C-alpha cells in the first residue's frame, strides 16, 4: 500500500504529485488495469504464449539483422 505523509510547508498538490509518482513506481495503476476485467485461465495462458512468441521473434530478428 502506498502512503505519503504531507511534509511541513508542503502543499496538498505537491503531496498528491508525490503520491501519484509512488503509485507509478510501485505499479499500482498497472495492476488496476490488469485486474479491471476478469480473464479466464485459458485466456491468460494464450496471452502468455503470444508474448513468448513475440519475444522470440524479436530476438531472432535482432540477432539476424545485427549479426552481419
Swiss-Prot record:
Per the record, the domain of life is Bacteria
Instruction: Give GO terms for biological process.
Output: translation
A cellular component term from Gene Ontology for this protein is: ribosome
Which Pfam families does the UniProt record give?
Answer: Ribosomal_S21
In its keyword annotation, does this UniProt entry include Ribonucleoprotein?
Answer: yes
This protein's UniProt keywords = Ribonucleoprotein, Ribosomal protein
Keyword Heme listed? no
| Single GO term (MF) | structural constituent of ribosome
- Per the record, the coiled-coil ranges are none
Which family does the record claim for this protein? Answer: Belongs to the bacterial ribosomal protein bS21 family.
**UniProt-listed PANTHER family:** MITOCHONDRIAL 28S RIBOSOMAL PROTEIN S21 (PTHR21109), SMALL RIBOSOMAL SUBUNIT PROTEIN BS21 (PTHR21109:SF22)
Name by which UniProt lists this protein: Small ribosomal subunit protein bS21
Per the UniProt entry, what species is this protein from, by scientific name?
Endomicrobium trichonymphae
Amino acid at each position: 500500500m502506498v502512503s505519503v505523509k504531507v511534509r511541513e510547508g508542503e502543499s496538498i498538490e505537491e503531496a498528491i504529485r508525490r503520491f501519484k509518482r509512488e503509485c507509478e513506481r510501485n505499479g499500482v495503476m498497472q495492476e488496476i488495469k490488469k485486474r479491471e476485467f476478469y480473464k479466464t485461465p485459458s485466456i491468460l495462458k494464450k496471452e502468455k504464449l503470444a508474448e513468448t512468441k513475440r519475444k522470440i521473434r524479436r530476438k531472432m530478428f535482432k540477432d539476424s539483422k545485427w549479426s552481419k
